[in-house]
Amino acid sequence: MNKILILSHGKSDLSELLMQICHTAELFDFQDYEMIDFDAYDAYAFLGGNGEEAEILLPPLRVKFEALRETGKPIFTEFIRSVGYYSSGHILKMDHQRLIYRGHDRKIDGLTAGDILDGHYNDCCRYDCLSKDLHAILTYHEYINAHDHTDPETESLGRGIPALWMLGENTLVASMRLCNFNRARFAPAENWQCVIRHILSFLADEPVSPVFPKSLCSFEENAILKSPSDTDKAVRMGLHWFQTADMLVEDGKYGVREGLSHHISAKDGTQKRECLIRTDCSGETGGAFMMDWLLTGNEESKRIADNLEDFCFNYMQEKKGAHKGMIRWTDNSWGICYQDDVARAILPTLLRQNYTKEGSRHFQDAVDGLQYLLRATGPNGLRVSSTLVPLLTPEIEARHKETNYRFTTKAHHNSFYQAMLLLAYRAGGPAEFLDIAVRGLTTVMELYPENERETSETEEMCRLILPLSVLYQVTGAEKHKQWLYQVAKDLERVQHRCGGFCEWDTGYKAACSRRENGECALLANNGDPVADLLYSTNWLPLGFSYAYMVTRDPYFYQKWLEVAGFLIRCQVHSDDPSLHGSWSRGFDMDRWEIYGVPHDIGWSPCCVETGWTMGEILMGLQFMQLVQKKI
């Protein structure tokens, strides 16, 4: 075993593994190089990835470094700005780029040429004057249209940016940050462990089998769900997450923050927070706490739920004037109104009005919000995706209402809006709500499954379960019941053996399918084992439990058990309080880890959204118990 010298800015995941495999390894700070007897070591690791910037070796140390290279001893450099005669004039930001194992001259055990690795929000030294004939081990590529493997020789990939490569016979160069691969949650974990094991073996000059650190996110893969009450632990963890992750603003008095974005720093694993306050997230989060109060009598949960409901209607709704009833999108987007976001914000209010004795203090406010949305709803019952107040002139408003102007047939934009019209009608709202909702869902279902799609075909199906359940509940029409079963049965085609639902998009027609530089689907190719807990699977616990309440068909109870079981098994368990109890957007159901195509501008696989994901899942996990208690 080689004796290894480590120069770095303190401990890291990689330095800890080096110390583990080599008990004589020693760690020094870069600035302490003068006290080191370099000749006393057999191998050297220069780790700059945990520093603020790419490391530039001081000239005296650089001279020593180049002399060491001449000895033939193994040297590994990580995020060092200049090596040999190569220097990096540009440090590239890597956000939507992933790495491909090229498999040319240097074999990494456990990897196959074309395997894909995600180094998250990274930095990469782009060295000038590298030979075009360089056969890099790992190369960075932008927007790879594949889940976890691709053809490395595909012409469209191009040469890529070298990320791991050999300089001469004895210097292994990592252009990127990778020393904190574990705390930065590089994925897939198995692929990265192969790479790290290769680096360790290179320095040790013999094969090694390190004990890798515990993953920051673990899962209870073998948890069993036999009854609705078996979700209690997951619900407790999920509700507690809002507190420990500091998402509630003044206990909900001023809303809830949007969540955690996908951007995880490769330097130290810090995950970026999204601090916008969204009305929909606030309403959905309030719904999760409301259901806890209804189930357990927890007065603290009731207080938070009331705070969030008050916030939505007291601060985020126009109370008078030309736009009376309008519910704002966010604390920043004061004049933008999305009907789908409004629908989800008022969902807890309408459930409370329908299924509790005391009802909701804000039922009329919710009705006003829906009345405002009707003003730009066409004769077919559908709306344009959003309303921008500065552009909504009386002329444009009339055009929407009279001619189906710019409407969309996406369930993503319209189905929950129609469901809320139905719930409001059921609780005493105007008959017009029923008429518009029936027309809207009929328009969509007459086109289904060829209606427009947002992220995937799977999402459109998941989005329809709750609205079609409410539609059948209100009308009792056999045709509407058949629609519900049709969509539910279609969903079975994309259900994974674990109970989750794979993303699927026949013909890749969705607006966000294979997109770049915007909102993007997690799906690369149909058949990828990826579940989307932001746009698809997250809607199903509430949808299936409502369908069971309406039909009393054990089929829907079983579908709820399957998806709820999947969700308690893929909930994050972590020593990090900002992660423990959360669900992330993307989940690979074969690898059983958070992973997927990271092309979305901010809401890629590792993101955690307070409303769409956390609030909706927690409501859905609890609602079945309320159904059993005959709400």
Regions inferred by a protein language model and the residue ranges of each:
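Solvent-exposed loop and edge beta-strand segments that line ligand/cofactor-binding
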Residues: 265-282, 327-345, 352, 396-414, ...
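Extracellular ligand-binding/catalytic regions of CAZymes and related secreted enzymes
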Residues: 146-236
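Well-ordered alpha-helical scaffold segments within catalytic/enzyme domains
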Residues: 217-228, 283-299, 344-361, 415-431, ...
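An acidic, glycine-rich "communication" segment
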Residues: 76-149
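CBM-like carbohydrate-recognition segments
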Residues: 501-508, 557-631
